[in-house]
Amino acid sequence: MRELTKDDVLAAVKGGSVFASGGGGWVDHGLEIGGAALAVGKPKLVSVDELPDDAIILTCTAIGAPAGRDWQMLGKDYIKAVQLIIEKYEGKIVGVMTPQNGMSSTINGWLPAAALGLVVVDATGDIRAHPTGKMGSLGLSSNIEYETIQAVAGGKPEIGSYLELIVKGTVARTSNILRTASDMAGGFIAAARHPLPAKYIKEHAAIGGISIAIDLGRAIIEAEPFGPAHVLETITEKTGGRIIGTGKVRKKDVHYSGAFDIGTIEIESEENTYILHVMNEYMAVEDRGGKRYSTFPDVITTFSIETGQPVSVGNIEEGAEIAVFAIDKAKIPLSSSVKDPSVYPEVEEVLGIELYKYAFEEKKEINV
């Protein structure tokens, strides 16, 4: 167990931005929420092995489309979502975890943990960011015997979009309800969900996910004074990732629908045109001939050639010079969530491409 610091906040945002895979929130939001956590308390990071098997851990997150522009999530909303669970749940909540890393989502839970006297557990529902709550639900999405409890809070009271909601039921049904609530609240909403014992977390989460992001962030911070090329080299070396290709953004065709950013981004190089399939995050990379280069749950990230910084889907602009980067799933801890075949059809239908087949059924990943 150790106390999280201001340096950890910056490192978590920097490293989390790589694992964000084009989504995972916003840098400014992550810094703000992390700073608020340190202002109201002393959040502590603990290994799941430090907790008794029956200690109850809650997942803290935010639900929505990162490119949305009419949402509002304040620090109090993250706290309120956890409080709603605490009020209704019969057991005692001991700690919080995040379902994913990201520009701000690595820091999910730090503020309510600091405010409510909980610990931050060093585990993630997925090492990278993903579009649906089911993909970070620790393999529970297809379990109809598990009754979860989920709560959300957020929106703009001045325009009547503020919502608080608490629901019980299966993971699949309740997750769909909260996605609708997010849309009604302006496109993003703070959430808390899935109280689970530490024993289950140990068996099903991506253990050490927070520390992995923080360690990468520290390496990035050390590399930044030496320029963007050195930053990209450092990230590649630290993660075992690879640059799939570099080029100019030829076309961005991404639209908002049902609290998701959906579409494609085309990166044109001298040798090839890469198509990035987007559902909030980058879910696959292929070329016009259909050759697949990377598929979720690989980490897929776009970097600015000019700055060496990750660029989110919402901030990608046509004409920008971009590097397409990937970390093969074999080089990251995988949770039960991303191995669960039931979480893929919804996303595959929206994108119009296959994911699970490429990720787990066939050896089709191309190392370049």
Label the model's feature ranges.
Residues 51-94:
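Glycine-rich oxoanion-binding loops at beta->alpha junctions
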Residues 10-62, 308, 312-330:
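N-terminal low-complexity or amphipathic/hydrophobic leaders
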Residues 213-269:
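Oxyanion-binding "anion nests"
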Residues 150-219:
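Phosphate/diphosphate-binding glycine-rich loops and adjacent basic-rich segments that engage nucleotide
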Residues 26-30, 78-79, 99-110, 127-131:
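Short glycine/serine/threonine-rich phosphate/pyrophosphate-binding segments
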Residues 251-368:
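C-terminal non-catalytic interaction/assembly regions of soluble proteins
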Residues 114-134:
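Short, acidic/small-residue loops that bind anionic groups at enzyme active sites
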Residues 51-67, 135-180:
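A structural-propensity feature for long, helix-poor, extended segments
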